[in-house]
Amino acid sequence: MPAMRPVRLIVGITGATGVIYGIRTLQVLRELSVESHLVITEMGKTTISMETDYAIGDVERLASKVYPVRDLAAQISSGSYPVDGMIVAPCSVRTLSAVANCSNDNLLTRAADVTLKERRRLVLMFREAPLHSGHCELMLDASRIGAILMPPVPVFYTRPQTIAELVDQTVGRVLDLWGLEMPGLKRWGV
């Protein structure tokens, strides 16, 4: 019987506000011993610096492997490299547009396109408001080709006391899509 490989997920962090979702996803994947492959756009790095106290190196060290956004020859740019899916957290309008239109001008969008063509799960935590019809059409187009749109909408039935609790609830729901159980995640009616 062949050896089982570890669960392997790609995490993309773009320049949209809400980079804490991507950072927390990496932290939880590490806690769950999930192999994570990270791509951060240049604007993602800028937003990390603006929104958090994390140094880029600290975020990168959370991942099992890190790739430069311009490295289109990276292993995750090929469907022959086995991964279980990809999470873009947060997902900018630019990235949503690239995914919806199959545009592969950087490693993050190439990896997303490969994820879809290989029929693997791609979650886009689209972070924009308010929306105009063009945004809605892009979301519909991305959904039609297989992406899962999961805007980081907070839930309040858990009676969150901190921003961290709001973030954890959303990250936990995303990881549910791979059958990964986030410790301490509050569920409806439980």
Located regions from the model:
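A cross-family phosphate/adenosyl-ligand binding-site feature
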Residues: 1-123, 127-190
